[in-house]
Structure formats: structure tokens, C-alpha cells
Amino acid sequence: MSETKMQEILGLVKGAVQVEGERVKVVDEKVLQENISAIIFQGVFGDDATKAVARWIIWEAAQTLGIKPASIHELYMARGRGEAPLNFTVPAMNLRMLAYDSARAVFRAARKLDAGAFIFEIARSEISYTDQRPSEYVSAVLAAAIKEGYRGPVFIQGDHFQASAKKFKQDPDSEINAIKELIEEAITAGFYNIDIDTSTLVDISRPDLDEQQKLNYELCAEFTRFIREKQPAGVTISVGGEIGEVGERNSTEEDLEAFMKGFNRVKGEVEGVSKLSIQTGTHHGGVVLPDGTLAQVAIDFDVLKRLGELARKKYGLGGVVQHGASTLPDSAFHKFVEVQTCEVHLATAFQNMIIEHKAVPESLRQEMYEWLKANVASERKPTDTEAQFIYKTRKKAVGPFKKQFWTLPEESLKAIGEDLEKQFTFLFEQLNIKGTKAVVEKFIKAPEIHHAEPLAVKAGKKESTEGLAD
């Protein structure tokens, strides 16, 4: 550990914390809250040695304050046993942009509503194009919790740790190893919830359902065993499986049965999955019309109800998961609770709110769009209008323009944060997670986990995200 870097970072917190051996002691929480923004900025934009020290101080200070990355596994299994209520749906939010300010807005909304059952997540594809490795993402979330005075378990999830069908076909071993490397990096960073997505390998051309799902359940089982080997002591990582690729045909009871029977048969003696993602009619990012607006999407809520009941009653899971939901109309969200959906994934709408926000200079938006035309023109379909092309690809500009957004004027970030908080509050109320801090405290016992020294900063190779879901 660099003593010089340590002193530089400690100087930023003005005596609020002290390093005692391998631990961080919080001496003055108020001063820490006042200065944590400077620490996370260094944790994101400093040189590698500075990043490592800043992230370590954030992690250790969070542990000391009782802000602990945790697995939601036990709560979901309690739902499967009928011991936990089914009258709320857990939102899982992908914070592609302004992760720290966005997470602050989440924690403010949660504190206001006494909510505890919510998840921060990021997908394999997003890690690449938003330029946020797992350790950075965890640090931003924990720094936000410190800033907003939040306490308790914090659920951070790897979303769509997904096999690319194209890469798998070319070189299966290489693709499997890439996912395992990402899993290990994520667990080390504090991701104690991981959604495995090998549904891309389902082959519906096969006449037999077991054959259709075989590669999916075999690889999901292999990754589950790997996760169980790598999870820290005292943590049972919540693992999710997926039976229907988002944007493809709707899932059926027969699909679920084929997957679960096969998965349980081959997984071995390890703890299995806690939930299953299914397809019900959505597309990630929505369906973009020629003018760049979104088409109304019809979700088959009956599929969620039927398959969720089957997953709980026959297999003891927490239920089923809905992906690609953030671009649905506001009137749809309460229906997830009515059909007892376990978890719903939300991403694109928050990105849209930030990019389109009136506090963001038009010149910055146009700079992003010009960058897209110069750098991702190959992704434009011949039938795409310019508005469609920009809407569908602008997420690819998030990483290259990350610093420009983080360094917007304070009043701009405040205005964006306030509007995000309103949206999170609305979603949390619709999904009925108000008051869920109590049920989380009942079922989730998160251990203190310390890092003896800063983790090495992984740059992570830029990988092609073609064909990967968000």
C-alpha cells in the first residue's frame, strides 16, 4: 500500500477517519459525509494507486458504519417457503451514468420510505461501455450510502453475466473463462448477487424441451458451482438463472420445468438459484420508433403470475424476474406487485433522464451524438433514422463522456439528483417496497467483510458487447 497515496486521501477527509493497521476507524462521521465526494472522485478518476487507496477507505469505512454489501438470497428463499410477504417487488437498478449521484438519490428515496429491499446492478455489457469495473461501481454505491447516512445491507448485483452466443460458438472455453473471470472480479469487489444468463444458448429448434434448455442449465449449474467456490465465508450469494432471452418469445411453464429439472439434476450438492428471469414481451431499451420515441409495450402479466407461482410452490424459489421494464408506462409498475413478481430490472429510463435533463448543456449532448456518428456508425441499420440510431446507441457514449458528466456544475448535479430521487420514490411506492427495511433486517444477516489492503485496480479489457443484453 502506498503510504504517500494513503496520506493524500486521508488529507481529503480532514481527520474524519484514521487507519489503524488493516482497519479504518471513523472518528467523525459528519466530516466524512461532508468530504466523501472528494474520495469517490479519486476512486473513479485518480491514477491506479490513488483509486485503490480511495476505494479501500470507502469499503472499510462503510463496514465500520454498518453499511455492508450483502446477498438477498435468504429473503428470496423465505418468499419461496411462504415465510416472507409477496406484496412487494424488488427493484434492481442499473446505474449507467453518474453512479454516485444516482445512488445518492436511491438512498434518499429509500430512507424517506424506510425501504431496504432494493438492488444496485450492472450488466457485463454495461461494465464495458460505461467504463465501470465492479470495484468502482461498489465504491460509488457505498460512498453514496455514507453520504446520505444510510445503514444496513446493500445489495449489489451482476446483471446479465451473459454468454455471447456468437463468441460461445467460436470458442466455448474462452467465453466460459471470460465469464468466470468477471464473476471472480465481481465477488472480490462486493457483488454478492449474480444473475447468470446463458439463455442466449437456448436452442428452440430442438424438438425436445430438455434439449432446448440443456446448454443453458448445464452452464448455469457450472457457473453456480464456481460462485459457491468463490463466495466469502458467511455469504450465500444470490444466483439467478434465466430461461428466456429478453426480446424473444414468451416463456412457458414447460420451459421453466425443463430448466429447473435439468439444473437440479446436474448442479451437484451446492445451493442452487434463488430466482429465474423469464420473457414476457419486453425489449431492453424499449422498441424505438422512427422519430426516436418509444412504442408502447405489452407485458403478459399473466405469464409472470403463473410462472412465479410455479417457481415458488414447486421449486422453493423467490419467484420470477422481469427484465427491460424501465421504459414501460408509469401505469404499469403496480401490476408487478399484483402478480407477485419477485424482482424487476430498471435501467434505460434513468440513463434517458440524465442525458435529456435540462441541466445538461445541449452542447454536451451534441458532442456525444457526434462521437456516436464517428465511432459507432457501423451499428446503424440501413432502416434506422438518425433519431433511432442515436437513441439505440447513445449508451455507448456513456463511458467516453463519464468525466464530463461527473464534473457538471454542482447545481446541475443537484437538479439531476432531485429529479432522479422523485423517479426512484415513485417506483419504490409503485413496487410497494415502503417499509421493507424490517423484512430485510429479519432475514438478511450480512457479515462484516474486511480487505486487509487495497484491491488491485483492474482496468479490464474492452470487450465487444455485440449481442450482449443490458
Language-model segments: which ranges?
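Conserved, mostly hydrophobic/aromatic
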Residues: 159, 239, 276, 323, ...
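Alpha/beta catalytic barrel-like cores
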Residues: 1-158, 164-167, 171-175, 181, ...
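Short, catalytically relevant binding-site loops at active-site mouths
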Residues: 280-284, 326-329, 350-353
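Glycine-rich phosphate-binding active-site loops on the catalytic face of alpha/beta enzymes
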Residues: 197-203, 339-358
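Glycine-rich beta-to-alpha transition loops that act as phosphate-gripper elements at the mouths
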Residues: 160-161, 243, 319-328
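Alpha/beta enzyme core
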Residues: 104-117, 135-139, 143-151, 170-316
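Histidine/acidic-residue-rich catalytic or RNA/ligand-binding cores of hydrolases
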Residues: 167, 288-290, 329-339, 354-365
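Structured mid-domain segments that build the active-site/substrate or prosthetic-cofactor binding neighborhood
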Residues: 321-324, 329-330, 334-348
